[in-house]
Amino acid sequence: MGRANDPAILTPPTVHATPQIMAKAPSGKPLSGKQRSETNETIRFLLKLALIVFVFRSFIIAPFSIPSESMLPRLLIGDYLFVSKWNYGYSRWSLPWGVPLIPGRIFGSVPERGDTVVFRSPDPEPGDTDPAHDDHDVIKRVIGLPGDTIQVRGGQVILNGKPIPKQRIADFTLPLTPNFDATHCESDFQDTDAAGQPICRYRQYRETLPGGRSYRVLDQRDIPEADDTGLYTVPAGNVFLMGDNRDDSADSRFAAPRGMGYIPLERIEGKAMVGFFSTDGSAEWLKPWTWFSAARWERIGEGF
């Protein structure tokens, strides 16, 4: 081992030259017992660390970032959340990359209406090669449980035959930033604030579910296919999910590939727990001070 790469071996050696040359070639020296022990300890430590991270992320808490505006006004692009993994049980989708190590669903429970959940999107339709339709993690709000009937009429959700109260409240305004620029806000909704800064302004409402749980939603305009739907009956083992930004959310109101249809309970990965960071996207790597000015500090620590 090591001699074939040592140029000194190519010279005519004497019987005693080889051990002398080996002693002088650091690359040819065998590891000492201490070095081997340290290397093995490092490998064992890294394996243990990887196992701890795998278990923690799969079964306790995992991070999640918000990539789109479908959950405005509650969640902004650039928000980072912790998601609790134990609320609804575990399935293969609880594990990184959906590794099929868990058969079916264990310790399962049904979410409550109004919960904000992270789930794995349905598999793309056969022949669908659009990368946007690849399975990925998504966040939406639970509106319907197994057996519920749901319909949207005139932009109002009808749950089990009764309209969910929808109260008009103050407009939702959001500054235009690199994370949410003019391409995300149509010209009809662009405005300026008191300081003359560009903002996006949407009509905002408060919905209140049976039992008193409430949350804010946006209604940008009248869109017939989103605001006036057929009657849905949620199948057993599934839930009906909607984005809070009702006119800009691909959710259970629409079948794939436009939406997602009903979501099987086993695809739910966890429940949104708390925001741990938020950025408006203006940070630059070569300007460290912008790492702080870009942070939306007031959003850190907001719970659900």
Annotated model-derived regions:
Residues 41-61:
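Hydrophobic membrane-insertion alpha-helices, especially the h-region
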Residues 2-39, 60-65, 70-304:
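Soluble "head" domains of membrane/secretory-pathway proteins
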